[in-house]
């Protein structure tokens, strides 16, 4: 007979650090995005540089919810073609998987996407002029902290997150 381990997975969520507890790094550049206040704040050597308004984010609780957590800038592209919507995303800054910070997107024929609900396919959208300024300022490897209490809400508790095995917790029975 093969015995199955008697450990129960314990749920944890993506790491979101609230503004109350966030401290920017004292050296180098950092980006802090608060998806509740819809603000993106930049820091350099621990000091505030500028604040931008976030125009759209992934809808909380949906498949496209923008994930909270601690990341780094992985890639910068002046113009990136989205694999989700086949639209151009100007001044794209990739921070995790298929998630980017970028300017207002436009179709391949050059027409901008209409302003709508304030939700995106998961990316963090800025005004294109703001995205350009951020793109020119940020470096590959810059810390990116994304905060959202939505990913921690009770409505969402069973749809997002990861499991961590806790060997001290036994399955009864």
Language-model features: locations:
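Gly/Pro-biased beta-strand-loop elements
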Residues: 7-111
